[in-house]
Amino acid sequence: MITLTGHTLTIEEMKRLLLEGEGVTACPNSMQKVAECREVVEKIVEDGKVVYGITTGFGKFSDVLIQKDDVKALQHNLIQSHACGIGDPFPEEVSRGMLILRANTMLKGVSGVRPLVVNMLLEFVNRKIHPVVPQQGSLGASGDLAPLSHLALVLLGEGEVFYKGKRVHAMVALTEEGLEPIELEAKEGLALINGTQAMTAQGVLSYIEAEATSYQAELIASMTIEGLQGIIDAFDENVHKTRGYKEQVEVASRIRDILHDSKLTTKQGELRVQDAYSLRCIPQVHGASWQVLNYVKEKLEIEMNAATDNPLIFDGGEKVISGGNFHGQPIAFAMDFLKVGMAELANISERRIERLVNPQLNDLPPFLSPEPGLQSGAMIMQYAAASLVSENKTLAHPASVDSIPSSANQEDHVSMGTIASRHAHQIIQNVRRVLSVEMICAMQAAEYRGIENMSTVTKSFYHQGRQQVPSITNDRIFSTDIENITHWLKTNYSIKERLDVNAAL
């Protein structure tokens, strides 16, 4: 059970929450702050003060005063009208993350909701009732209005949820769990939907997958180094320490550890003086992608613990301030950066694939074919990888440089952060498939070189891979092989924990 405080949630805890189904509880001190802040909102309503989103309309309607008797209707209408999401739903892990992050931000005690609302969010998390939230429709400011409205709907007993492996009406799950839908009161609808939790939850899942995929890329690249009898000197610690980037040093160190007892690597001058960049520069390129990941992790952990709704309530109600913390620009930039960093892992992987299959670049059978000419072997697998790499270049176009005004130009600059976050996740899926092609080719090359000559780590990795796909002895439908390795990498070389190279032993 992980305790939410509004201030201390980490990526490591989110791994447990999203991927292992761990439960959550609220810090009592934080819940007390929630209750105290709620008293301020109720006094504002009672006194008839004019405060945005509590006693006024929203967006361009912020100058419309709402009567006390209509305050509840205002919040319900807000959720109904803003539930304009379209397209396929987010992965269930993302909608679970949205519930967790929305509860965590409310526990900062500046949003003005009742403790009941926070408790309801936590009940959904712990009972694994996850909102069906369409992926498209958010501008990323005022936050993720459309996606979060679909989240809010299910608290009211409306909309759909994922529950016990099925997609059902929210009331089906609530009834089975013995829960009553809530009725929103002043400020609560706005507090639920005005924030960045859709882009951030998707960003967190993308980061977790990207981290695991990056470790996997090092193992797979190490197998390719063996298949091409790569020069190990290029990974010498002295080379990388003189550059000064810790991530580069760490990648080189891990590859040295993976290959420390390999009989397939060579010394410079033994077969050739230098390797091509796609081998020799693995630490520099992969290390730079790790720099991106470290940046993204830092920004996500800030946003996971941020108050991103509007208005915010401070000093016991002395200050009720309309600001712009819902603007998703920091996450939009981070997700666009993640897109570039991960796309580059596929770029260099595809070039290593080419070196494995091109007979002009190695002494292996052409296209790793068991019968060159009669059988094409891995020829078209390289095409598939090249296609994914090209697709990634399109997806990597920065969403954050775009902005379209909305709400009659009141909201005249937006982040498009949710688009960036979604595209980052798509890129990561493509990267995993490119790496799967590289692994298939590297395993085949290892068989020509002699499996007994592989390092202890890569040999173990090879044998586990061969449990997923057989050796290429004849042409067959290779799309199945690619998907099998892709699924295995995602579920077993898992996104649940950081890949330690020793885990392959």
From Swiss-Prot:
A GO biological-process term: L-histidine catabolic process to glutamate and formamide
Residue positions where 2,3-didehydroalanine (Ser) is found in the record: S142
Organism: Bacillus thuringiensis (strain Al Hakam)
HAMAP family documented for this protein: His_ammonia_lyase
The name this protein goes by in its record: Histidine ammonia-lyase
Keywords of this entry: Cytoplasm, Histidine metabolism, Lyase
GO molecular function per UniProt: histidine ammonia-lyase activity
Gene: hutH
Any Pfam family the entry gives: Lyase_aromatic
Record NCBIfam families: hutH, PRK09367.1
Signal peptide: none
Protein's UniProt keywords contain Cytoplasm: yes
EC numbers, comma separated: 4.3.1.3
